[in-house]
Amino acid sequence: MDSLLELNRVNTAREIIRKKIQNTGRNSIYDLTGLCGGFEICEENLKLIETYVGPAIFSEKLNNAGLSHLSGNSKIHNAVCFNRTSSAILSTIMTLSKSFEKLVHYVPEKPAHPSIPRSCKIFGMEYFESDSLEEILSKIDENSFTAITGATMDHKVVSEEIACKIIDYAKSKNSPVFFDDASGARLRKLYKESPALEMGADLVVTSMDKLMDGPRAGLLAGDKNLVDKIYSEGLKFGLEAQAPIMAAVVTALERFDLNNLKDAFERAEKVDLSVFEAEKIEYKKTPTGFIIKNSSEEKLIETALKLLENYGIVTITAAGMPGASKNIRIDFCSKDAERISDEYVINAVLNSLK
C-alpha cells in the first residue's frame, strides 16, 4: 500500500482515538494490539534521565537485565538499546553490509517485517526471503548474512528444529546469524523453545512493547564485538535509545512476568470462535488471541476503523505503522483485554465486518 495512504490511515485512527478520549475518557478505548506499551520509571531513576548521566547508569542495568531476559552469557554477550526495533535492524544491516553481500532471511510464513528488506535496499544489500528451509540452506554461503524471524507479524512461531538447522548450517559457512525475535523472544517461551542466543545465534533483537509492558524500543543482544560495532554505527545516526527510554526499558525488563502471557495464552485457547465459521469468516487462532483474514486490505482496514470508531477497539490494522500486516489481530495479552469480554470483542468484529 502507498506510504501516503498508510499515513492517512494512521492519522484517521489517531483522530478517532483522540476524540473518543476527549469525549468519554481513556476507559472507552481498548488497545488489543499486543503492543502493550508502558513508560514506567521509578522515582530514583527519574532523577537521572539526563543526556550523559542517564546512559552511564542505565546502560549497565540494561545490559544485565537484557541479558537475563534473552538468556545471554555476560562473558561473551552484551545488550544495548535502540529507539525502535526497526532502528536496531537498520543499524545491524548498515554494519553487516560492509562485510557481506547479501542477506538470506528465513520466515515461518511470508512476508517478513518490512524493516529488514527496506534496510537491505538502503545499503545495496541483496535480499532473499523464504519460508522454505531447503531454499534458505541453498542460499547461505560465506558471502551471506543469515536472518531468522522467531515469530511473524501474525504470531506464527518458528520451530526450534528448523531454527537450529539454519543456525548450524550458517555457522559451517561462517555466516553470522541474526534472530529477529521482536515478539518471539517471549512468545516462543510459551512453547518452551530455547532462546535464540542459547541456540547459537550471534545476535538477537526484541521489541520492548510487544507482549510486555515496555516502551516502543529495541533491545539488541549478542556477540560483544558485533554488538559494539552495531551500536557504534547506530550512535552516528541517532538510532540509540536516550536516557528516558533506557530507564523505562530497565523497569519493563525487571518487572516482566511470563504468567501474564500464560493467562492470555489460556484465554485464547478457550475462546469460542465457532460463530465465525457459521458466518464463513476467515480466521485463525494465535497463541494469545486470533486474527481475521481477508483477501482485500481495504476491507480489513475499513473493518478495523469501524472497530475503533464504534467499539473503541484499537488494532494494528487501524493504528499500526506503514507496512505492518493488515490482518486484524486481537491480542488478549494487552492490559485493556482484562476490561473487555470475549463476547464484546466477537460481536464487535461481526458487526464491523457487515
Swiss-Prot record:
InterPro entries: PyrdxlP-dep_transferase_arc, PyrdxlP-dep_Trfase, PyrdxlP-dep_Trfase_major, SelA-like, UPF0425_MJ0158-like_C. The keyword RNA-binding does not apply. The keyword Isomerase does not apply. SUPFAM superfamilies: PLP-dependent transferases (SSF53383). Its cofactor is pyridoxal 5'-phosphate. Signal peptide: none annotated. GO terms for molecular function: L-seryl-tRNA(Sec) selenium transferase activity. Gene3D superfamilies: 3.90.1150.70, Type I PLP-dependent aspartate aminotransferase-like (Major domain). The modification N6-(pyridoxal phosphate)lysine is found at residue 210. Pfam families: SelA (PF03841), UPF0425_C (PF22583). Keywords: Pyridoxal phosphate. Belongs to the UPF0425 family. This is UPF0425 pyridoxal phosphate-dependent protein MMP0002.
